């Protein structure tokens, strides 16, 4: 349960994960009073300039610390000691609240500060964490209680003007940032046809869509992105290339297939709008898209990630997976295979809501990188992109 895990972690981790003689870094003032995030440096996507913060920190990291930056790991329900030990041993660089907390903003801030105290020289080379949550609104709002607004569903948000949504999103973002959450796994940019919305299990049935056409979805998704950015919170456009045309939910079902979406589909325009608005993260779905790549899930498809997302839509930020740790869509693959295949196909940041699965993926990636120079270069490029994103959100030790 998130509440118990968060409070336990806040109360017990003041000395955990530290090497002898080291001191836990004090939480940055930006946790409570952030300024706007900087635009991601162009070096993030073409091999960073030698003088950049990211490359300086990268050069000081061990290979294990670098690989640890590739992970966004769910921590709900995990004992505080296990989380701290995993960060110390496997150097995981980003952590994800999951489940529903009613502890309130003050308690969540305390937990987030305790998490950031784990960013020691030995654990993460003093690179602080993206602390993420799914704070979309409606049925998908993980942080609740005193200090948090009741965020309406995206379908309700879509009825606001874009300007009003941006204003309200900035307020929700300030709440997240005050709680120490600096990455929102939102907005949902999937376009769900109105005629099939109730049969669309992952999005429409939960009213997670802003509307039923690319224009409405794009405009309101961009407003959400801009509002959160004003508050200093990074955002994630999901679930590329869209879950609006499927029936099953990849969290709970395998073999989810989209037979409609192709490289020129109009529904991609909502994601294109988010990319033009400089969204820093795009999450890739765990469905199969027969008109794009009939042989691979999108998160394992170079056609989807390298061809469509990078080359056609010119996305230059961090590509993050949907849950590779516990989703039913990937249950038939070993964790080691999941992580390696995602990175090899063009992904950057691995989401795993399972700590054991994350550990298995981490170790497999380290082994493959040690044995394969080309894969090691792929890993290093992904790490640089993640570090550049962290630099933009003031999480690097260069400030």
Where in the sequence are the language-model features?
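Second-shell loop/turn segments in exported
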Residues: 40-45, 73, 77, 97-103, ...
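DNA-contacting surface of Y-family translesion DNA polymerases
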Residues: 41-110, 141
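C-terminal region of N-terminal signal peptides and the immediate post-cleavage residues
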Residues: 12-42, 46, 399
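Hydrophobic faces of well-ordered beta-strands that scaffold small-molecule active sites
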Residues: 68-75, 93-97, 129-135, 183-187, ...
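Mid-to-C-terminal alpha-helical segments outside catalytic/metal-binding sites
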Residues: 370-398
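Second-shell residues forming the walls of enzyme active-site clefts
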Residues: 62, 82, 106-116, 215-370, ...
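Bacterial N-terminal signal peptides
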Residues: 4-14, 134
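Glycine-rich, aromatic-flanked loop segments that form ligand/cofactor-binding clefts
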Residues: 116-149, 168-195, 217-241
């Amino acid at each position: 349960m998130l509440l118990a895990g968060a409070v336990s972690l806040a109360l017990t981790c003041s000395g955990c994960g530290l090497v002898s003689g080291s001191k836990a870094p004090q939480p940055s003032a930006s946790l409570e009073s952030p300024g706007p995030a900087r635009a991601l440096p162009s070096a993030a996507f073409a091999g960073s300039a030698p003088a950049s913060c990211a490359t300086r920190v990268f050069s000081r990291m061990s290979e294990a610390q670098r690989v640890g930056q590739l992970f966004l790991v769910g921590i709900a329900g995990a004992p505080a000691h296990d989380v701290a030990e995993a960060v110390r041993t496997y150097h995981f660089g980003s952590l994800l609240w999951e489940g529903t907390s009613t502890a309130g903003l003050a308690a969540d801030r305390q937990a987030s500060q305790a998490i950031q105290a784990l960013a020691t020289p030995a654990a993460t080379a003093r690179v602080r964490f993206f602390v993420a949550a799914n704070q979309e609104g409606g049925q998908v709002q993980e942080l609740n209680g005193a200090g948090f607004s009741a965020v309406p569903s995206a379908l309700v948000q879509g009825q606001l003007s874009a300007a009003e949504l941006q204003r309200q999103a900035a307020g929700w973002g300030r709440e997240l940032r005050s709680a120490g959450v600096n990455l929102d796994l939102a907005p949902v940019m999937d376009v769900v046809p109105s005629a099939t919305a109730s049969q669309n299990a992952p999005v429409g049935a939960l009213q997670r869509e802003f509307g039923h056409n690319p224009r409405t979805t794009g405009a309101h998704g961009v407003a959400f992105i801009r509002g959160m950015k004003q508050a200093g919170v990074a955002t994630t456009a999901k679930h590329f290339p869209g879950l609006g045309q499927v029936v099953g939910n990849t969290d709970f079902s395998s073999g989810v297939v989209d037979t409609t979406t192709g490289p020129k589909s109009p529904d991609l325009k909502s994601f294109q709008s988010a990319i033009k608005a400089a969204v820093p993260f795009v999450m890739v779905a765990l469905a199969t898209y027969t008109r794009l790549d009939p042989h691979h899930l999108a998160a394992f498809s170079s056609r989807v990630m390298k061809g469509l997302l990078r080359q056609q839509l010119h996305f230059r930020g961090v590509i993050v997976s949907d849950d590779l740790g516990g989703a039913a869509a990937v249950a038939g693959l070993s964790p080691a295979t999941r992580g390696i295949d995602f990175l090899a196909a063009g992904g950057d940041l691995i989401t795993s809501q399972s700590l054991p699965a994350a550990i298995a993926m981490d170790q497999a990636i380290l082994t493959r990188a040690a044995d394969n120079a080309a894969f090691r270069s792929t890993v290093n490029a992904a790490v640089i992109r993640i570090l550049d994103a962290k630099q933009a959100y003031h999480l690097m030790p260069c400030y």
